[in-house]
A protein has these predicted regions:
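A composition-driven surface/loop motif
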Residues: 1-187
Length: 187
């Protein structure tokens, strides 16, 4: 239900956060800031810790300057409109962003445009999310004879069930175009 969004700040219509002040949000369950239409942020200092997304605009998310420290259980900056492919756009013009997201740092279902800014992005569990499975019983020294098929294993290989849900963990993600005009990125 679109009317029951758990967020510290929630608007059914457009929402604008404007000014040079500071805002600290702790959302132990749910989102930090959500607008069901356009979310516009113009300046300010934001510290957001959210179990779900940090900043979300359904129709669009537009940010002009500001300082953002976001730790989120899902996406850090998020714009998504499943009903209209022309919406869900995300625009960033300058600012400083430190984003630690379990999902994508910056995600748009439409176009994503970045015109400058400083970005320090960590997604998933950082380097700890990388795992390597060498396979039990694999002999890296055995290369076989060229031209011959490898011998069949004596025992059937064990299989693991894969999860059907996968979490996207990208720094910048868009289902449409991504345009970057300047800026500094660390991932």
């Amino acid at each position: 239900d679109d009317n029951n969004i758990d967020a510290v700040i929630f608007a059914k219509t457009d929402l604008t956060l404007n000014g040079s002040g500071s805002l600290t949000i702790q959302a132990q369950a749910g989102h930090g800031v959500v607008s069901k239409d356009d979310l516009v942020v113009a300046g300010g200092n934001y510290t957001i810790t959210a179990a779900s997304t940090g900043l979300t605009g359904k129709d669009s998310l537009s940010i002009s300057d500001g300082s953002f420290a976001i730790t989120s259980g899902k996406d850090g900056l998020h714009a998504e409109n499943a009903d209209d492919a022309a919406l869900g756009c995300l625009y960033i013009a300058g600012g400083s962003y430190t984003i630690r997201a379990q999902g994508d740092a910056v995600s748009a279902s439409g176009a994503l445009r970045v015109d400058g800014g400083t970005f320090d992005l960590t997604t998933g569990e950082g380097s700890a999310s990388v795992t390597m499975d060498t396979g039990e019983g694999f002999d890296p020294g055995h290369r076989g004879v060229p031209g011959q098929a490898p011998a069949a294993p004596e025992e059937p290989a064990q299989t693991e069930e894969a999860e059907t849900d996968s979490v996207s963990e990208k720094g910048l993600k868009a289902d449409d175009s991504i345009t970057v005009n300047g800026g500094s990125f660390t991932a």
